[in-house]
């Protein structure tokens, strides 16, 4: 990639912009009636709803990272069907960081128990047409792009 450099975390940073690209994974988990969302908190204390998942570690395989993230955030074991989409997040609390999250279709194979120690304040099964206020716009757009999801 022209004008980019590798950071210590193995991600690419935009040369001219001085920003950083962070790789991550998100789980799109559906029961047939609802989608699993988690509530997290910004650095300023405001909360938001998003899909479970997070950043990948250096050299971590995306599916292994997704399983690790759901264990950490929700104590949940998952079955990963396959990649379905990609979403982008600009993290204002992380300096000039742009995150690229690969989204995977998943099913949970255990109970879901939010872990506040990992920043997961709540978890809910929500119909896609009844998203709570403060659901991230990237999540709303993703669900709109996938009308096959439950409503």
Briefly describe each language-model feature range.
Residues 87-113:
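Active-site-adjacent beta-strand/loop module that shapes the phosphate/pyrophosphate-binding cleft
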Residues 17-21, 48, 94-100, 117-120:
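A generic structural micro-feature
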Residues 30, 34-72, 76:
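Conserved Nudix-box catalytic region and its N-terminal flanking loop in Nudix hydrolases
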Residues 1-26:
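Acidic, metal-coordinating catalytic segment for phosphate/diphosphate chemistry
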Residues 77-86:
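A short coil-to-beta-strand element that immediately follows conserved catalytic motifs
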Residues 102-105, 114-147:
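NUDIX/MutT-family hydrolases
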């Amino acid at each position: 990639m022209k004008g980019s450099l590798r950071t210590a975390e193995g991600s690419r940073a935009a040369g001219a912009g001085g920003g950083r690209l962070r790789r991550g994974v998100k789980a799109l988990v559906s029961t047939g009636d609802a989608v699993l969302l988690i509530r997290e908190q910004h650095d300023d204390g405001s909360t938001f709803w998003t899909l479970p998942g997070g950043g990948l570690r250096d050299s971590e395989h995306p599916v292994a990272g997704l399983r690790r993230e759901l264990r950490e955030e929700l104590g949940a074991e998952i079955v990963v069907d396959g990649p379905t989409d990609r979403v982008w997040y600009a993290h204002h609390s992380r300096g000039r960081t742009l995150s690229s999250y690969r989204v995977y279709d998943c099913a949970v194979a255990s109970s879901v128990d939010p872990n506040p120690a990992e920043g997961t304040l709540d978890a809910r099964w929500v119909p896609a047409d009844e998203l709570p206020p403060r659901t991230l716009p990237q999540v709303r757009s993703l669900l709109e792009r996938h009308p096959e999801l439950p409503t």
